[in-house]
Each structure stands twice: as C-alpha cells, then as structure tokens.
Swiss-Prot record:
Protein name, UniProt field: Large ribosomal subunit protein bL28
Organism lineage string: Bacteria, Pseudomonadati, Pseudomonadota, Gammaproteobacteria, Enterobacterales
Keywords assigned by UniProt, alphabetized: Ribonucleoprotein, Ribosomal protein
Record-level Gene Ontology MF annotations: structural constituent of ribosome
Superkingdom of the source species: Bacteria
Biological source species: Serratia proteamaculans (strain 568)
GO cellular component: cytosolic large ribosomal subunit
HAMAP family: Ribosomal_bL28
Amino acid sequence: MSRVCQVTGKRPVSGNNRSHAMNATKRRFLPNLHSHRFWVEAEKRFVTLRVSAKGMRVIDKKGIETVLADLRTRGEKY
C-alpha cells in the first residue's frame, strides 16, 4: 500500500538528517497516515480510508459525504 493520504494527497518527501557537525544524510519524511473507518449515514455502511491527521480534520470540517464526492470525481476507489 502506498503512503499517500486519500483525502489530501500528502505523500512522502525527501530531505536530510543533519548531525551536530552539519553532515547531511538523506532521509524521508513520511505523512502521519492511519487507516480509519468512517460511518456514511447516506449509504448506511462504514468506509475505510487511509488518511493523514490533516485529512481527518478536513473530514471533520467538510463532512464525510462531501469528501467522498470529491474522491468519486477524482476516480479514486474507497
């Protein structure tokens, strides 16, 4: 499973670890992803989404039906 938020599209980015001597070694910054079940009242069922913490805040703000409508227009499976 790819490390991509289904709501916000957040994905891993690359950067550097920096030691005290400012030596750089490559690293990845991973999104804070969770598999979470959301109850969809209109469909009377649970939907499991892989969302970041910010994605959960977006769902709290907009509502799950609105977010699922956006996913459908993008052609994403859920």
